[in-house]
């Protein structure tokens, strides 16, 4: 019976319950970015928490409504989840203040010049276009467990909080169980041939 439990646990570690986006399954690149009050936020300061890293533009028609969904998740797990929103030019302090007021944003909105999002979105001279919003789910050990890219249109980014909530809940249970996936992070995808 113990052998079966071990095999099932090992299987859960190798084959995650949720499919990961194409930018997942790797260590989250570190960053230190300022917010609108020029307070700096370092990703390492949030180690031990699950992070919803949302790369947005304030003019985006779906970014504010999705933020309300993420805030609901943060309120459900206040000591375990942190939301960080990242904006890039042409967004500025005035746009961000208005975005914060319009959508009652209670979590940090950080400013990037493009280098941080370039590393997260794996931008290159050949692949230089980015779509916003883009959400990254980072586990307590600093690994990108999943990512979601907005595919366009006027529909909401997330119709409900279910897809993200299910994954966050699974990560919280994993944390409470003592971190079945140790600091080595999630299983790495097989090498492409």
Regions found by a protein language model. Give the residues of each.
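N-terminal "domain-start" segment that seeds a small globular fold
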Residues: 18-43
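Short hydrophobic alpha-helix segments
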Residues: 44, 121, 146-148
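Short active-site neighborhood of thiol/selenol oxidoreductases, capturing the structured segment around
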Residues: 41-64
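Thiol-/selenol-based redox modules, centered on thioredoxin-like
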Residues: 132-193
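Hydrophobic beta-strand anchors of alpha/beta hydrolase catalytic cores
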Residues: 52-53, 83, 135
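Structural microenvironment flanking redox-active thiols in thiol-disulfide oxidoreductases
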Residues: 64-104, 115-120
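Bacterial N-terminal signal peptides
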Residues: 5-16
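Short, internal strand/loop/helix patches
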Residues: 100-132, 138
């Amino acid at each position: 019976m113990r052998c079966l439990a071990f095999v099932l646990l090992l299987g859960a570690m190798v084959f995650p319950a949720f499919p990961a986006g194409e930018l997942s399954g790797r260590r989250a690149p570190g960053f230190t970015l300022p917010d609108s009050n020029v307070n700096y936020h370092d990703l390492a300061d949030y180690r031990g928490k699950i992070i919803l890293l949302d790369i947005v533009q304030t003019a985006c028609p779906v970014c504010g409504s999705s933020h309300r969904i993420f805030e609901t998740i943060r309120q459900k797990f206040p000591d375990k989840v942190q939301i960080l929103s990242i904006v890039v030019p042409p967004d500025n302090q005035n746009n961000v203040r208005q975005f914060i007021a319009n959508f009652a944003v209670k979590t940090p909105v950080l400013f990037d010049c493009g280098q941080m999002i370039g590393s997260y979105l794996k931008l290159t001279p050949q692949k230089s276009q980015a779509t916003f919003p883009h959400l990254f789910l980072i586990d307590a050990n600093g690994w990108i467990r999943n990512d979601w890219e907005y595919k366009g249109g006027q529909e909401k980014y997330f119709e409900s909080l279910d897809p993200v909530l299910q994954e966050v809940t699974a990560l919280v249970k994993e944390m409470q169980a003592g971190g079945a996936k140790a600091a080595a992070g999630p299983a790495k995808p097989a090498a492409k041939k």
